[in-house]
């Protein structure tokens, strides 16, 4: 019997393993940490922001083993009742979170070519956890599944239909776990019923996306088949004319691999500013008179406002605009610049509410007479993953807290 059940949440990236341990009763985080530099000589683990310690083994199983040792040191190893995994891409196969079985692992492996950098890493985490935590139910939570409610007209590209039929080329969308969590919080904050509601959510971080949520379901989103489409991001270009890329290739002789690196790693805020992908650095530079930092920020907010307005067209009514993610939660400048560009909706920002720090938590930042309220809601993907694990996993009766 587990007296104090906890949920271990694992997010295996292309070179890191982020993890959290949450109290299963309250879903409050007890431990957070990261094993970084996986599969390199400099691999390390850091817990609760503490000093990094080198990993004895540098692969994913070594990272999970180090996490297990940290749990043992805190007498939590025997308390792990469930494990929730963030899986980057569920393709068209997974429309919701699911308990992990051998069949599910095989299905994830089959669709992993859609996200090779992340899905194979995710599976490495699943296999390592299976070995280190035998008998503990694991649950897969897909970054794409929330968007499986998109209609064909929202997910199809204007390409020959055979590419969709034969290759699965379509919009899948990402940040689904974040958009789903924030939408659920927004119904309470804005005092609106989920079953008759229209929200546009802006998840703004180094990666950024917009999602239109109608009656609790995603009906449109800005990211596409990959997380490259849509908004200008930290190092990703977002929407770009393919003809422009073809012209660059012709003029420079760059290969497809070269251009893929450019649009993913050298573009966005970094590419326009020539300075940094970090918005905090760019905001300071703008105030110091750096012209291209200003240009990068204004391009960033123009694209955000345009996508918010466009996504509102997928709703029957706009009940609220919600900002989340590291930038959405913490940058009063970005929220101000974006809402200034949304006056067509009758949005009126309250400067005092907007100026509150991110630590102020969930809050409405518009005036009482604003036609459409805007809010800040901190995302909590780890909590959403833990809640899904609790809802779907097999838990000892003593842990029947859901």
Swiss-Prot record:
It is an enzyme of class 2 (transferase). Pfam families: Acetate_kinase. It catalyses: propanoate + ATP = propanoyl phosphate + ADP. Substrate binds at residue 86. One of its GO terms (biological process) is L-threonine catabolic process to propionate. Its cofactor is Mg(2+). GO terms for cellular component: cytosol. The record marks 175, 236 as: Transition state stabilizer. The active site is at residue 143. Its EC number is 2.7.2.15. GO terms for molecular function: acetate kinase activity; ATP binding; metal ion binding; propionate kinase activity. Keywords: ATP-binding, Kinase, Magnesium, Metal-binding, Nucleotide-binding, Transferase. Mg(2+) binds at residue 11. InterPro entries: Ac/propionate_kinase, Aliphatic_acid_kin_short-chain, Aliphatic_acid_kinase_CS, ATPase_NBD, Propionate_kinase. Pathway: Amino-acid degradation; L-threonine degradation via propanoate pathway; propanoate from L-threonine: step 4/4. SUPFAM superfamilies: Actin-like ATPase domain. Disulfide bonds: none annotated. ATP binds at residues 11, 18, 175, 203-207, 278-280, 326-330. Homodimer. Catalyzes the conversion of propionyl phosphate and ADP to propionate and ATP. Belongs to the acetokinase family. TdcD subfamily. This is Propionate kinase.
């Amino acid at each position: 019997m587990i007296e104090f059940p906890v949920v271990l949440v694992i997010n295996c990236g292309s070179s890191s393993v982020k993890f959290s341990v949450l109290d299963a009763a309250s879903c409050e985080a007890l431990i957070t940490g990261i094993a970084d530099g996986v599969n390199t000589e400099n691999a390390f683990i850091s817990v609760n922001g503490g000093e990094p310690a080198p990993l004895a083994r540098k692969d994913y199983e070594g990272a999970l083993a180090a996490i297990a040792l940290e749990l043992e040191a805190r007498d939590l190893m025997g308390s792990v009742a469930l494990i929730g995994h963030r899986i980057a891409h569920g393709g068209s196969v997974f429309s919701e979170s699911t308990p992990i079985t051998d069949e599910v692992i095989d299905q994830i492996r089959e669709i992993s070519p859609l996200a090779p950098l992340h899905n194979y890493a995710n599976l490495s985490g699943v296999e390592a956890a299976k070995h280190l935590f035998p008998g503990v139910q694991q649950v897969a939570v897909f970054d794409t599944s929330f968007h499986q409610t998109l209609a064909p007209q929202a997910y199809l590209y204007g390409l020959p239909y055979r590419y969709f039929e034969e290759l699965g080329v379509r919009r899948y969308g990402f940040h689904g776990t974040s958009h789903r969590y924030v939408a659920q919080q927004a119904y309470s904050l804005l005092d609106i019923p989920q079953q008759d509601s229209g929200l546009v959510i802006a998840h703004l971080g180094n990666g950024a996306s917009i999602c239109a949520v109608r009656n609790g379901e995603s009906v449109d989103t800005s990211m596409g088949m990959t997380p490259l489409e849509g908004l200008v991001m930290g190092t990703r270009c977002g929407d770009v004319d393919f003809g422009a890329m073809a012209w660059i290739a012709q003029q420079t002789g760059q290969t497809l691999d070269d251009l893929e690196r450019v649009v993913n790693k050298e573009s966005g805020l970094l590419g326009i500013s020539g300075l940094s992908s970090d918005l905090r650095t760019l905001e300071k530079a703008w105030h110091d008179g750096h012209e291209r930092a200003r240009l990068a920020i204004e391009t960033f907010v123009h694209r955000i406002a345009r996508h918010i307005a466009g996504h509102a067209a997928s709703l029957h009514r706009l009940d609220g605009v919600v900002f989340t993610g590291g930038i959405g939660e913490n940058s009063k400048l970005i929220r101000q610049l974006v809402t200034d560009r949304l006056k067509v909706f009758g949005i009126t920002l309250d400067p005092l509410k907007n100026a509150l720090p991110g630590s102020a938590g969930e809050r409405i930042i518009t005036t009482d007479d604003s036609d459409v309220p805007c809010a800040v809601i901190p995302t909590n993907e780890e909590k959403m993953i833990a809640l899904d694990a609790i809802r779907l996993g097999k838990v000892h009766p003593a842990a029947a807290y859901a």
